[in-house]
């Protein structure tokens, strides 16, 4: 699919009737979008076929011209897909490139295709179709990522690890429970994707430049043919806004944020200092100078791509924020942001799905870490509330003294002699040691949504039924 700049005067054949001369070379360069909007060729052709079919059905063009147009458009589709189509920058965009080639193939009948249509509603349609398809693809990819986490959660429903706050040891949890946290996050992301598909499921074609058209078109017919629920209801809004693209970018940014947090954890967990997980060779790289290195580059690149996605969201919001209704050429700058973010998001989800499925979990290292840092201190406080009848604030204070004592002795809470604990509070008995193991700690957290293995398995079953 080569690009050419050599076809002189072709740039104004579609719209240049009132112009005495062609545009300056710099104007051609800044005005051209074919370098990136050629990605919309399939959507543009699909929309044109639906439009031509409707025009013929309504008696606006002849059936003979419609057949020529459809045959010509299918020929162009084959040319582009096979790499035998030469794109021209002087023809500005994908719409003009296809229409010019159609005129070469079928002659004057090509000029009837643009009846009751503007490039304003045409590009709104193409872009909306592309974003809709991308959202559907994202939904499927998120479903795959959720499935990968469900498998790991089931495998590790009882594997104890430290839970963190402030990246400091907080309480024991299970790795399965930690995995299910990401199932919830990516599940919400997928829900946002589904809602976005509902929001954009309206056909723009037929809005024309901004005011609609005087031709007796059937917008419901084209909407149905293109797989939309219904046509848009306001022609000015139809060509004015790109909130469907911004919503896609916002979803991509939120999803990217979740991916980035996970990537950060994988980077930390894979360090020798943590040693919780080991990435497979398939998702790691080495060093050109240090032979021993195995770097988590896939995770780091997922983390970085989130920055690109965030930048795309801010860019499009900034482009749109000051535009009066209806269409302005500023909106030509909408597509590159979305195309780039979509590519980054696809790569990030695919890479993360592979890492989650392939990584090796060091359960022994996780369990050992879970028992350090006085992670069962809350369990001691809860025991004092239940068994000694202390108010929680008093129990919290007593436990704090026990932690300070254990820290001064260089031991864990469970290693403190009973006499030492009773010196802090006389109602402590030897039964307290039953709650100071990490296994007992996680098993006790049976509240809805808690980390107890039994509760984790309930949540896995809930999500498997919905994934």
Swiss-Prot record:
CDD domains recorded: Argininosuccinate_lyase (cd01359)
Recorded GO CC terms: cytosol
UniProt pathway annotation: Amino-acid biosynthesis; L-arginine biosynthesis; L-arginine from L-ornithine and carbamoyl phosphate: step 3/3
A single BP term in Gene Ontology: arginine biosynthetic process via ornithine
Annotated signal sequence range: none
Keyword presence, Transmembrane helix: no
EC number: 4.3.2.1
Top-level class of the enzyme under EC nomenclature: lyase
GO molecular function, one term: argininosuccinate lyase activity
Record-linked InterPro entries: Arg_succ_lyase_C, Argininosuccinate_lyase, Fumarase/histidase_N, Fumarate_lyase_CS, Fumarate_lyase_fam, Fumarate_lyase_N, L-Aspartase-like
Protein's cellular compartments: Cytoplasm
Main localization of the protein described in the UniProt heading: cytoplasm
Keywords: Amino-acid biosynthesis, Arginine biosynthesis, Cytoplasm, Lyase
Catalysed reaction, written as an equation: 2-(N(omega)-L-arginino)succinate = fumarate + L-arginine
Annotated family: Belongs to the lyase 1 family. Argininosuccinate lyase subfamily.
PANTHER family per UniProt: ARGININOSUCCINATE LYASE (PTHR43814:SF1)
Record's protein name: Argininosuccinate lyase
Organism listed in the record: Rhizobium etli (strain CIAT 652)
Gene designation per UniProt: argH
